[in-house]
Amino acid sequence: MLEFAISAPLDTGAELLSDQVSANFPWLSLSILFPIVGAFLVPFIPDEGEGKQVRWFALGIALVTFVITVAAYLYGYDPSLSGLQLSERVSWLPDLGLTWAVGADGISMPLILLTSFITALAVLAAWPVTFKPKLFFFLILAMDGGQIAVFAVQDMLLFFLAWELELLPVYLLLAIWGGKKRQYAATKFIIYTAGSSLFILLVALAMGFFGGGTPNFEYTNLAQQSFGTGFQLLCYAGLLIAFGVKLPIVPLHTWLPDAHGEATAPVHMLLAGILLKMGGYALMRFNAQLLPEAHAQFAPLLIVLGVVNIIYAALTSFAQRNLKRKIAYSSISHMGFVLIGIGSFSALGTSGAMLQMISHGLIGASLFFLVGATYDRTHTLQLDEMGGVGQKMRIMFALWTVCALASLALPGMSGFVSELMVFVGFATDEAYTLTFRIVIAGLAAIGVILTPIYLLSMLREIFFGKENDQLVSHTNLVDAEPREVYIISCLLVPIIGIGLYPRLMTDSYTASIQELVKRDELALQRIKKPSALMIRNTTMTPAVVSSPRLPISQTRSEQLTRK
């Protein structure tokens, strides 16, 4: 008994010390810098011409980066806390107000994990690349660090730099390794994304210099500023354009089908799995969190734009005869649910938007990888030239079927849970009139109905029907190889796991989403007159009115100190 009484406090103290060390370890800086440093080491890797050593080196760097992000989640992140964790702050250029500030909360941590996971699989998907392999994997690894930085940095100028950092790798990956129209697609991508990102810089400067004095661009400082409603509306509109291009929002979407139409399979996976999520994340982080009064005014517009995305892109996808463009428009349609969830003043709806981003990242990456694998065998993307290959590629057909069912939100898959959460969250959101909710839900349901029609029709045209004699005689229709089965299996495990037990993912961000929604509900109360009749200007419950401000400056270290 005496031994137990003595050892228990020692164990508790050791555990607390271990937690403090884990929380203070620079996990996020390491996850950003490690792949970037690895990218700059790629040119020094011995290469016999086909890039075998480079492939293994890049895969090792990507896997270690994934392990670092998982370790950050397990040893430095507490899902029950809504505030900023894993925070690191180093003064960089104080005269310009620029600070190396990184951290993670429930809005960013799941996307950091998604980024490192998808990138590791994209490197494996790039195994057949033999043309300029050093440059290819250099760009992939640099893109990995830049995308993690987008989700991890806590300074708006740093965010802009990270946002721009990933543009050049994508441009080169499209322009050098793309299809016949790769130059057009790459140029269109850079014009849309680089041009729209100027709004981010202008808004960052306006918010950082607001009120005079020394500029400060950290999110913690910006969240405490009392920006006027008019100022917020201007900033919100500019950011909506910038992030709407990346999401993308119709009509700012036209770069995406062209980019997907010319990209290779690993670039597809990065575009669909990560790049589009940057737009959704930024809308949550900046528009909804830092500009709450403007968000309360713009929220109905987001919901309407979400419905337009769902219906327009679904109808357009239905009419596409090019396989890549069909899946690209399907991605745009699914991202419409993210807009509806963000536009709702419901914790369930916003949580559904977050889960939809994660779910679509996994499902979109799997579908586009299969598109690339199918093209490698058939050498065509035109559905009219396919057909009847199911007998020769049975495993490939099985993989396509499971991933297509996941995309059409089959129960038991992650897409079903996320879309259901958005629907139920918005339908029960009393910030909008019943009529508006019924109309929006009904229109969104049309897109849900169209999705299985065009996806199942696509499967029929690829694998069933009369066998194309010319296709069979001029191509090598071999079945899926072990590497391809492994990649899809890795993606299906979380897709099915989240579908069967959503709390595997939702518990990691619920606390942060609840605080975000409380902040927006308080802003809704401060608006004297609604921006549209769809918003009810009624008194919220006392629990909501008295809720605390968003504690994004609270770190895990502070929590441990209190304990």
From Swiss-Prot:
The family this protein is said to belong to: Belongs to the complex I subunit 4 family.
UniProt-recorded Gene Ontology molecular function terms: NADH dehydrogenase (ubiquinone) activity; ubiquinone binding
Chain's role: NDH-1 shuttles electrons from NAD(P)H, via FMN and iron-sulfur (Fe-S) centers, to quinones in the respiratory chain. The immediate electron acceptor for the enzyme in this species is believed to be plastoquinone. Couples the redox reaction to proton translocation (for every two electrons transferred, four hydrogen ions are translocated across the cytoplasmic membrane), and thus conserves the redox energy in a proton gradient.
Major localization class: membrane
Localization terms from the record: Cellular thylakoid membrane
Catalytic class of the enzyme: translocase
Listed name of the protein: NAD(P)H-quinone oxidoreductase chain 4
PANTHER family: NAD(P)H-QUINONE OXIDOREDUCTASE CHAIN 4, CHLOROPLASTIC (PTHR43507:SF21), NADH-UBIQUINONE OXIDOREDUCTASE CHAIN 4 (PTHR43507)
Superkingdom per UniProt: Bacteria
Known EC number: 7.1.1.-
Primary gene name: ndhD
TM stretches of this protein: 25-45, 56-76, 90-110, 111-131, 133-153, 157-177, 189-209, 230-250, 264-284, 298-318, 335-355, 356-376, 397-417, 438-458, 485-505
Pfam families: Proton_antipo_M
InterPro entries tied to this protein: NADH_Q_OxRdtase_chain4 (IPR022997), NADH_Q_OxRdtase_chainM/4 (IPR010227), NADH_UbQ_OxRdtase (IPR003918), ND/Mrp_TM (IPR001750)
One GO term describing the cellular component: plasma membrane-derived thylakoid membrane
Annotated membrane topology: Multi-pass membrane protein
Organism of this sequence: Prochlorococcus marinus (strain MIT 9303)
Substrates-to-products reaction catalysed: a plastoquinone + NADH + (n+1) H(+)(in) = a plastoquinol + NAD(+) + n H(+)(out); a plastoquinone + NADPH + (n+1) H(+)(in) = a plastoquinol + NADP(+) + n H(+)(out)
